[in-house]
A protein has these predicted regions:
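Domain-level signal for soluble alpha/beta catalytic cores
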Residues: 1-340
């Protein structure tokens, strides 16, 4: 039997997965603009393959692709009546790939409906989350992730709804171009408020790359020293004056040249561990190569992963499928060594 997320976190850092919607858009399965996840219904094999890539890279958690799978958001693409089918399919695909190797997280996301002064809007958000959770929990997710909340108030509703399921709850906020929530709360204030509301894991995700989340994460760590801390940054470079990648003119179609290298994401994972982050994952732009390097520095590479080690004593032909005589190559290597 798999250990639950809280048990695993007590044993040390847990490695999450990467981004789904932008990567699937690049592959031709998700529409830019709405970024809704109907791929779980229309092209389940494409989603299954991406889950497999993250699993094989070393991810210990797979998130069901239910981000933006709420009724109102799906209505923007005429799929409001497929909410249950979509949420159910997304969880089943993730669980099938996860098997006994990974945990599966249900997912709630920002709704674009939250209004801080409107009780009716808050009730609508609450009903939206409850509707998705009923399906996801019924399909057997291991815990709930609520993410990408710029409004702390909306994040608190996610905590409230998710806690009623009885499952562990992780909720992360996102900062746009200021180090504040939409209400003007600091990272420390947000983290403490979420923990006090019952969140088991708190932190930050999306919008910003690693370099622009470390400071607020350190503030969170100081504010909630006994809580589990999560980080899931994007894998794109952004300038200091515009850390939110969605505010850049390159979003969403010209982000390729801004993508972080696998080594940069490995450095992020190492730094995150050093400052006390417990759940180390990634978001938009992070693909399996990034997760694999993160797994490497966190010593979480799957046992079956083959590690290629550079050996400058060997010619490149030793690594490529060139048509050559192995004996001849060996003789040349011996001669080269003898000449030294």
């Amino acid at each position: 039997m798999k250990n639950g997320i809280l048990q695993k976190l007590k044993q040390g850092p847990v490695l999450g997965d990467g981004g789904y919607l932008l990567e699937l858009e690049k592959r031709g399965w998700v529409r830019a603009g709405p970024f809704t996840p109907e791929v779980a219904l229309t092209n389940p094999e494409a989603l299954r393959q991406l889950h497999i890539e993250f699993r094989e890279a070393g991810a210990e958690v797979l998130q069901a692709l239910t981000f933006y799978a709420s009724r109102d958001k799906l209505a923007t693409v005429g799929l409001q009546d497929r909410l249950e089918d979509l949420n159910r399919a997304a969880v089943r695909i993730a669980k099938e790939v996860a098997g006994q190797r990974c945990l599966v997280a249900g997912n709630l996301s920002l709704t674009w409906m939250y209004e801080p002064e409107s009780s009716a809007a808050k009730d609508r958000v609450r009903a939206t989350f409850d509707e998705q959770l009923a399906v996801q929990v019924g399909e057997g997710v291991d815990f709930i992730i609520g993410e990408t909340f710029s409004w702390l108030g909306e994040a608190l509703i996610a905590v409230e709804c998710a806690k009623r399921t009885g499952l562990p709850v992780m909720v992360t906020i996102c900062f746009e171009n200021q180090n504040l929530t939409a209400e003007g709360k600091s990272a420390a204030e947000a983290a403490k408020t979420l923990v006090d509301a019952g969140a088991d894991i708190v932190g930050m995700n999306c919008l910003r790359p690693p370099e622009h989340i470390f400071k607020p994460l350190e503030e969170m760590r100081k504010a909630v020293p006994n809580a589990f801390l999560a980080a899931q940054p994007v894998a794109y470079h952004t300038p200091a004056d515009k850390p939110d990648f969605t505010s850049l003119p390159q979003f969403p179609f010209e982000l390729d040249n801004l993508q972080l290298s696998r080594k940069e994401m490995a450095a992020y994972a190492q730094r995150a561990r050093e400052i006390g982050v417990d759940y180390i994952g990634a978001c938009c732009g992070a693909v399996a190569t990034h997760i694999r390097e993160m797994a490497r520095v966190l010593q979480k590479l799957p046992a079956e992963q083959r590690t290629w080690a550079l050996n400058y004593e060997k010619p490149m032909s030793a690594y490529e499928y060139y048509d050559h005589d192995p004996a001849e190559v060996g003789a040349k290597n011996i001669a080269r060594k003898s000449a030294k």
